[in-house]
């Protein structure tokens, strides 16, 4: 019996390069990964950043944890393994956007170094900008 991997033929080396796409879009694609407690303002900040960059002529995509949980990760819970899988999935999606030359703003709680390191490894160190949103607990509880 053939394994599934026997029928997979990646074409990464044949597609138009990230650099060519960035040149076409006149921008330098990165993944801006906003992390912090739930309610810390990640999404609010992402929306403002998206609007500012878009008004300056940049192509931007927000990937928000709540939106992702209603779609490609709707079968996952909040166990440690499912949190890792959620971040793995979104990091792979982010990598696709970045490789298309699109600035990607991600809003995810990402509570552990293990989770953030996994995302950074998938997306690529050179394409990953991690930002911790430091908000006190009383702000997050509102």
Give short role names for the model-derived ranges.
Residues 39:
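Walker A (P-loop) phosphate-binding loop of P-loop NTPases
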Residues 1-32:
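Extreme N-terminal, non-catalytic leader segments
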Residues 69-77, 94-142:
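ATP-dependent NMP and nucleoside kinases share a basic, alpha-helical "lid"
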Residues 42:
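Conserved lysine of the Walker
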Residues 29-31, 59, 103-105:
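Residue-level preference for the first positions of well-ordered beta-strands
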Residues 47-95:
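Conserved substrate/cofactor phosphate-moiety recognition/catalytic segment
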